[in-house]
Amino acid sequence: MAEMGSKGVTAGKIASNVQKKLTRAQEKVLQKLGKADETKDEQFEQCVQNFNKQLTEGTRLQKDLRTYLASVKAMHEASKKLSECLQEVYEPEWPGRDEANKIAENNDLLWMDYHQKLVDQALLTMDTYLGQFPDIKSRIAKRGRKLVDYDSARHHYESLQTAKKKDEAKIAKPVSLLEKAAPQWCQGKLQAHLVAQTNLLRNQAEEELIKAQKVFEEMNVDLQEELPSLWNSRVGFYVNTFQSIAGLEENFHKEMSKLNQNLNDVLVSLEKQHGSNTFTVKAQPSDSAPEKGNKSPSPPPDGSPAATPEIRVNHEPEPASGASPGATIPKSPSQLRKGPPVPPPPKHTPSKEMKQEQILSLFDDAFVPEISVTTPSQFEAPGPFSEQASLLDLDFEPLPPVASPVKAPTPSGQSIPWDLWEPTESQAGVLPSGEPSSAEGSFAVAWPSQTAEPGPAQPAEASEVVGGTQEPGETAASEATSSSLPAVVVETFSATVNGAVEGSTTTGRLDLPPGFMFKVQAQHDYTATDTDELQLKAGDVVLVIPFQNPEEQDEGWLMGVKESDWNQHKELEKCRGVFPENFTERVQ
């Protein structure tokens, strides 16, 4: 029996719910069709819109916060792995290993604490805040259904009120019929029954209307109070949430900054203690390493071998080649020392070919007066001197050679015009005391006490010696050696090879570095590739000095000091260096 009762209650409840759904659906259809009016509350509808907006924003904030926490978790894992990697590569003998391990542990704890506080103070608060929205949302939906029930009950009650007159007319018609067919006493009972039935339906409709109105108003009043309050609470919730996140993040970064600073101090200390292991590799000549001697200057572009310059004693002009040697681009020695960048080729300048007549013209009558003739007081002629005797018949003492090394021909190979020759200063001590110095540019020749002007044959014989075209039959010219007049000519030309004057006075060498050999001028820029090399610019003058250890000298390289550095510092050890010879041109 109990089972039958429970089944009946369940069936009745289902039937009631179905009846309610049908009634609500019918009412909504009538409202949409305009046949039934709908109760509206604009203020409540605005609150519902704000509620939906607030729910959307809160849901999005919760989603983004969960993403942020997931990123913090991932960052924690990445930082943990990085710290583990540091612990693995940090060798036990290195200083500060314990401090580094402790910093790694504190780093891990700091990340865990930061993540947990974010969960407690931000995520859980967000979940609590959003937990009230589903209940309110369901109450709003229920309030909408109760509003439909209220409208349906109201419409039903109003329909009964308007149909009262129609029912009375329907009841009056049967009464008239009954009056005709039934006795008088029976007609009154029938009319009373119809009136009672109509009143019962009206009373039921009124009760349902009052009940629906009461339920609706209760829910409506509650929601009217809660929705505005919930909407206003969003500001404080957002402020507290983001303040908590910002404060936690600030404290986290402060603590993390301290840990990072401590780790940086440990690493700096490690770097300082192991700084001696870092050194700069500098190439030094040794027995095991290949020397610079293996390096040789690059051959010229025309393929001709680079030969050592030789001194031309006969002073013949060098034959002009097809292409001007000035266009040759010098190359630095290769192998161990990297060569400098290829300099731009210089402009071609036409070389002036010296004719033999121009050379011979230096020894005719116009050239003889420049020779100052001195007569030593203790000199006695070996025999009578005739007026017709030539210079070749004289036996005069040869001049000592200049102490400075003879300048080799310039790499450019261009002939220097004779009009650019400059007189040579003789060394101190060459001439006897009391004799005039040759600083004025005249050639000092020791003549006998009885002198005579040279005859016309003198220039011809001298020119034969200068030109180097000695005939086999001329015995007088063949006997002329370096002890006769050609010694003067050789001395003159050796002092002015390629137009460069060799200053060899003692006073001129006071400002030169010890062991000075000659001067060169850079023709192209050279960038030093090692610490022992000179940095050259086109036009720099370099004072060439010998190597301290001749075995260290490499082929194609010279040791020297820039003239500007020497004049400024006067410190040979700091200013000297090596440089490629084929990037320079000898000037003195």
Curated annotation (Swiss-Prot):
One of its GO terms (biological process) is synaptic vesicle endocytosis. One of its GO terms (molecular function) is RNA polymerase binding. One of its GO terms (cellular component) is endosome. The modification Phosphoserine is found at residues 296, 298, 304, 324, 332. Highly expressed in the brain and muscle. Isoform AMPH2-1 is expressed only in the brain where it is concentrated in axon initial segments and nodes of Ranvier. Isoform AMPH2-2 is widely expressed. Residues 2-122 are annotated as: Interaction with BIN2. It holds the Pfam family BAR. The modification Phosphothreonine is found at residue 308. This is Myc box-dependent-interacting protein 1. It comes from Rattus norvegicus.
